[in-house]
Amino acid sequence: MARYIGPLEKLSRREGINLYLKGKRSYTEKSALRKRNYVPGQHGRQKQKLTQYAMQLRSKQALKRMYGLMERQFRNTFEEAERSRSGETGEVLMQLLERRLDSVVYQMGFAPNRRTARQIVTHGHILVNGKKVNIPSYRVKVGDVIEVKEKSRNIQQVREGLELVQEGYRNIPNWLNVEIENFRGTFQRLPKIDEMDVPVPLTNIIELYSK
């Protein structure tokens, strides 16, 4: 399945959840979801009663799209969480998603959304413990230091991300310690389930993949 390249805010409208895919626009009244809170298409305004399977599928699609993963990537991550003995499957799944380097770069405020964070990582603008890492799926460990390369600190995407934090549109999560003035942050600890932005019932995803 190819990566989605269409209008990003249509994805939020389709899922009925703000997936924060458009940077600053997603946090304001200009958000397409706030202006048109119904699914795209000719019959979008008509409320549809979803089956249990459809609700489970929608939950999976929403979380997958929020983190920008393809089906195989998401399924592999879920199966790893399911095998883990370090906690409940849902919590471990979210922790694995939040430990992706592109997600950490976004959460630290160095990008306005996860899609842009993925591009920033891929283009070699990010250092992990002083070394360049250009793999968005790289798994960050507790204690890792994430930094924007000195030569990359004035690129527009990084500035846009930091503006969202500085203008109060976004907050940096408690499990991260970020020195905005130094374009650097530390992944201090694993996040707890009640600290993460979980837009869907994780039990829906667990039940879907258990079939």
From Swiss-Prot:
GO terms for cellular component: small ribosomal subunit. SMART domains: Ribosomal_S4, S4. Signal peptide: none annotated. InterPro entries: Ribosomal_uS4, Ribosomal_uS4_bac-type, Ribosomal_uS4_N, S4_RNA-bd, S4_RNA-bd_sf. GO terms for molecular function: rRNA binding; structural constituent of ribosome. It holds the Pfam family Ribosomal_S4. PANTHER family: 30S 40S RIBOSOMAL PROTEIN, SMALL RIBOSOMAL SUBUNIT PROTEIN US4M. NCBIfam families: PRK05327.1, rpsD_bact. HAMAP family: Ribosomal_uS4_B. This is Small ribosomal subunit protein uS4. The lineage of its organism: Bacteria, Thermotogati, Thermotogota, Thermotogae, Petrotogales.
